[in-house]
Amino acid sequence: MLKSNVSYSTDKDSFTAGKACAEKAVVDLIETKVAFVFSSVKYNQNKLLEGAKSVLGTAPIIGCTSSGAIIVPAGVVSSESGFAGMLAIGDDETAVGVAGSERGKNPRETGKKVAKEAMAKVGTDKAPAYVYMIASPGEEEEYVKGIEDVVGCVP
């Protein structure tokens, strides 16, 4: 059964915020397979990730920044000094393959490459049940077409 937790922090220190999010998000998870992090642009992102990794170890971290706020089960979280939120997923049954790439010259080919790499990390050629992608605006559709070339219709 899929297990997940959501956490957040408004600590002023980037490292402390990342660590606090991770500590709360991994509670009762058997093995953290992936963590999604969304944070304020006010944080030093490298320090935030260092804090999170100090708890998560080698679990992949995916995410991006927000200039305004994040939404968690408790409501909208925002702070002038910074904010971060994390969704951690981990259980015995879930397999997660994470891959990334620089933009490249051909977004569709980049999408294919990333899809193949993520599937290889899981050790399967079976299409995933879920695909999550973060890309700069403008070429997302071409990345998705490349992913679909490999996995079929993107779930």
Regions picked out by a protein language model, each given a short descriptive name:
Residues M1-P155:
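Cofactor- and metal-binding active-site motifs of prokaryotic enzymes
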